[in-house]
Amino acid sequence: QRYVPSINDAWVGTLTKIDNEAEPDAIINSWWDFGHWFKYWADRKVTFDGASQNKQQAHWIGKTLLTEDEDQAIAILRMLDCGGTKAEAEIYSIVKDTQKSVEITYKILSLSKDDARKELLKITNESHTKEILEYFYCEPPENYYITSGDMVGKSGVWAHFGSWNFERAKIYQYYKGNDVISFVESLKSELNYEDKEAQKLYYELSALSTDR
């Protein structure tokens, strides 16, 4: 069988240039597909690659590709470069709920360091707050953000992860494991839904399940 490699001189030249010119602790951010190339030819760390998709990197990088808010994208990249997914993981260790931890993470990303500190002190102590802030607001290493033409055809994939709605996922988990009464109570207490709104959603989900 004939085999045409995906790597080419353009890629090698670009990545070799990064290897020659980038700071030793520089990080390359991109979609995961070519992460192993980046590590080999550029000899730098990457956000994630084919061997490191066990956390939420796909959501955060997907979001940077999707968002029209440049400040949000920069804040996400700083967070990833400062500590990978440790910021959200530490918040999760406090609230024990993925939807809540991601929601808080997005809120922190939109705040100044001083305001973020105040927000974190609502849920944890001073020393833990200081640790978490470092994962959001360290002096980040040099950052290379790589996009390539093939990513246009892959947009359905990174957009799927980047636009993942954690609240909807949580609602579906409640639906799968509860009857209508428990479902409604969960949405009221956890997500501030009204009775009628929660009941309507339950029966909409039931109809979808039946249609399948």
Predicted feature residues:
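Extracytoplasmic
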Residues: 1-212
